[in-house]
């Protein structure tokens, strides 16, 4: 048996993943500004505070360098951040940046960037070592 369900977005319903899709215009500066705006929306979802243990601290990769891998990592508290919404937004940022890098034939360094080690300061997640 196969179950199939369809849904129709109604006014006031949460935005779906397609609402984060960026259409590159051919203007490199304007296209990068779109990616940064989407990245800023992702950053607005992050809350590094409200954790009672360092085990609740997480990192999330941001962007996509031309040679692969993220540009950097965001630090957040899993208890106070909607990680599903965050990663939906960050996946859109990475996809847009991959397309941007390809369209404009950008290159980057190819070193592997490790996420930072995390710790708790008060009730706020912080890097204890810098990410590379």
Segments from the language model and where they lie:
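Sec-dependent bacterial lipoprotein signal peptides
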Residues: 1-4
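Bacterial signal peptide processing site
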Residues: 6-9
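N-terminal low-complexity, Pro/Thr/Ser-rich intrinsically disordered segments
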Residues: 14-41
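Extracytoplasmic/periplasm-facing segments of secreted or lipoprotein envelope proteins
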Residues: 31-67
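Extracellular disulfide-bonded cysteine-rich modules/repeats
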Residues: 58, 114-121
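Mature extracytoplasmic domains of secretory-pathway proteins
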Residues: 59-96
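Functional cores of ribonucleases/endoribonucleases
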Residues: 84-117
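Short, low-complexity, Pro/Ser/Thr/Gly-rich segments in the mature regions of secreted, periplasmic
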Residues: 121-132
């Amino acid at each position: 048996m196969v179950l199939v369900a369809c849904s129709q977005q109604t006014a006031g319903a949460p935005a779906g993943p397609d609402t984060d899709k960026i259409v590159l215009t051919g203007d490199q500066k304007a296209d990068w500004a779109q990616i940064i705006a989407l990245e800023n929306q992702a950053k607005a979802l992050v809350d590094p505070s409200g954790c009672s243990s360092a085990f609740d601290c997480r990192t999330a990769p941001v962007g996509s360098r031309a040679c692969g891998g993220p540009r950097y990592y965001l630090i957040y508290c899993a208890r106070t951040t909607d990680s599903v919404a965050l990663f939906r937004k960050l996946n859109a940022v990475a996809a847009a940046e991959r397309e941007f890098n390809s369209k404009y034939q950008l290159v980057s360094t190819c070193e592997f960037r490790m996420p930072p080690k995390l710790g708790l300061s008060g009730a706020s997640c912080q890097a204890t070592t810098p990410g590379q």
